[in-house]
């Protein structure tokens, strides 16, 4: 199975790719399965069971809300972040879930969504089960999901078949041969030397099996645009992050200090590090606040890639759009190697 660069960069919401984005995708996938099996009209009840790590940190990571939003048909890539609190409040206050945003069913949060942190699945610690019931309370359909890091989800059936994890649904690149296949960094370098190509050229050629050159560039530009907006929001946000600890945001304070500093980078080269830190803090704090971020390759690591790119844009005179695209392609492929040969799930290998 081929892991695309664009599998690694997934637009979603914070605070966690494995505990927020993955569960939301699981809920949305469950709705899709109900529809494909023509069971959707019969559904009058839903139960969600969070297990292992998803249950242990479920409240803090908004895993509970994420699954419900997925069952409402919301996608992490386009969801209206500002509307989330009202949607969740409506579910809890009215004991009603609007399935796929069109079918109201009875749903009592305290009864129909359960947390079982001590129940550990042997395959993966990030486990959830979603079940649908008819008007008589008989089970219509149930599915076990694993959220395996980076927003990727895998069903129990896929795990039994020992398939590699990927985000659902599978895309066409699985079905086509790549011109320059590689599964390790050594194999990537061998392809470069053998064919006289740069890493960017090898990776782009593989991506062009499924996407045109123009679509690749447009998608990379969009990914950077979302990252850039996340930096801007984080740099200008003040106050404390959500949660009982009342952690103070640091990005804005550092940003203002740098803007007002009498010293410039030419006088103090180490100041560049402070700028990079400010950019990374900005993204990380937006992620912690449940804002829109791009997995790179996870939400937890989402600040590094944007910070480096913004450094490149602000401090390298020769910086251009092509350089950003090249960086995203190569970095994404390196992330895919980690996913393919190890893990990007903190709960699994952190």
Locate predicted features.
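N-terminal glycine-rich anion-binding loops that anchor highly charged ligand groups
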Residues: 1-4, 38-43
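N-terminal signal-anchor module of multipass membrane proteins
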Residues: 2-13, 26-30
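Cysteine-centered functional microenvironments
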Residues: 7-17, 51-52, 290-295, 344-349
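Alpha-helical support elements that line or immediately flank enzyme active sites
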Residues: 20-35, 306-318
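A structural-propensity feature for long, helix-poor, extended segments
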Residues: 41-80, 84-99, 323-350
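C-terminal regulatory domains involved in ligand/effector binding and gene-expression control
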Residues: 76-264
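Accessory "access/gating" subregions that flank catalytic or transport cores
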Residues: 210-349
